[in-house]
From Swiss-Prot:
Residues 144-168 are annotated as: Disordered. Disulfide bonds: none annotated. It comes from Mus musculus. One of its GO terms (cellular component) is acrosomal vesicle. Keywords: Cytoplasm, Cytoskeleton. Specifically expressed in spermatozoa (at protein level). Detected from the elongated spermatid stage onwards; not found in immature germ cells or somatic cells (at protein level). This is Cysteine-rich perinuclear theca protein 1. The lineage of its organism: Eukaryota, Metazoa, Chordata, Craniata, Vertebrata.
Length: 168
């Protein structure tokens, strides 16, 4: 019995030691990572995208000298022509959603109607004398009126010409 008790005691002690070793290992690794963070101050800087880094390194804009590229949206005053051109070229590479497709169709329809309205010129109207206007008005009014068709007379003696309808 004493031997069994010693084995149990040693096994629990070994398990406790192993658990303590694991905990100390975890503590050491966390301390190491904390030291690395303290030594490397760049990790504390806010994260920037590659595009914004390129913008900061590129030469200044031609219109406002804001030190960002013309395609960047971080500055509203940058060259709108180049931004518009850029958005049209990159449109090919993205997948268009249903909503986007509907808005594109609306925009195309609007542009077509505007171009058609520009093409259609109003016809010049000739000045008519008052007598010509009245003649044109009455001729147009009479053209719409049609003569009533002749209706055959109805015989009162036979209300139902068909015998089948009268019997039912």
């Amino acid at each position: 019995m004493a031997q069994m008790a010693k084995k149990v005691h040693w096994s629990s002690a070994a398990a406790g030691a192993a658990a303590a070793a694991k905990i100390s290992k975890l503590e050491k690794t966390t301390k190491r990572f904390k030291l690395i963070k303290k030594r490397n101050p760049s990790s504390k800087l806010p994260k920037r995208s590659s595009h914004s880094l390129l913008c900061s390194l590129s030469r200044s804009c031609c219109c406002c000298r804001c030190r960002c590229c013309c395609y960047c949206r971080c500055c509203r005053c940058c060259c709108s022509r180049s931004r518009r051109f850029r958005s049209r070229t990159t449109l090919k590479f993205f997948q268009i959603t249903e909503k986007g497709e509907q808005s594109l169709q609306r925009r195309i329809r609007r542009q077509l109607t505007r171009s058609q309205l520009e093409l259609i010129e109003p016809e010049p109207t000739m000045a008519l004398e008052p007598s010509e206007i009245t003649v044109a008005f009455f001729s147009h009014k009479n053209a719409n009126v049609s003569d009533p068709e002749e209706v055959p007379p109805c015989l009162d003696s036979d209300p139902f010409p068909n015998g089948d309808l009268a019997s039912s």
